UniProtKB/Swiss-Prot annotation:
UniProt-listed InterPro entries: Ribosomal_uL11, Ribosomal_uL11_bac-typ, Ribosomal_uL11_C, Ribosomal_uL11_C_sf, Ribosomal_uL11_CS, Ribosomal_uL11_N, Ribosomal_uL11_N_sf
Organism: Anaeromyxobacter sp. (strain Fw109-5)
Stated name of the protein: Large ribosomal subunit protein uL11
Database matches in Pfam families: Ribosomal_L11, Ribosomal_L11_N
Keyword Ribosomal protein among UniProt keywords: yes
Length: 148
């Protein structure tokens, strides 16, 4: 069994990892081959690259400077922005500046359910209903209305 020397958590655009910050400095201090990681990450996330999603990744670095990485599902906020039409390649919108007072978009319960199903593997929620409530809470704090 290899000895783990570090674990790095990053959020990178799908299919667009490059040696520039934050990837280069984070991996460089652990002695990892940066280009090798970029190639592997970009190959693994090629399918999501068209959707311009941010993919969280956990990189485990071993004593012999080898590494493994685990991809997570995109953050709920990114998926909600996409569903509400706030997140596109051209327009990278943010949530409301005053959540609770102003609304920047809306999503249907069906879209919330779809996002919850996508996020279930990375959530600690015990059921789909609980996951949906979590996603609805995220939407509320972003100023996105849930309708239907």
């Amino acid at each position: 069994m290899k000895k783990v020397t570090g674990q790095i958590k990053l959020q990178l655009p799908a299919g667009k990892a490059n040696p520039a910050p934050p990837v280069g400095p984070a991996l460089g201090q652990h002695g990892v081959n940066i280009m090798e990681f970029c190639k592997q990450f970009n190959a693994a996330t090629q399918a999501q690259a068209k959707e311009a999603l941010i993919i969280p990744v956990i990189i485990t670095v071993y004593q012999d400077r080898s590494f493994t990485f685990q991809l997570k599902t995109p953050p709920a906020a990114i998926l909600l922005k996409k569903a509400a039409g706030l997140h596109t390649e051209k327009k990278k919108g943010s949530g409301a500046h005053k959540p609770g007072k102003e609304k920047v978009g809306q999503v249907t319960r069906k879209q919330v359910e779809q996002i919850a199903k996508t996020k279930m593997q990375d959530m600690t929620a015990g059921s789909l209903e609980a996951a949906m409530r979590t996603v609805e809470g995220t939407a509320l704090s972003m100023g996105i209305d849930v309708v239907g």
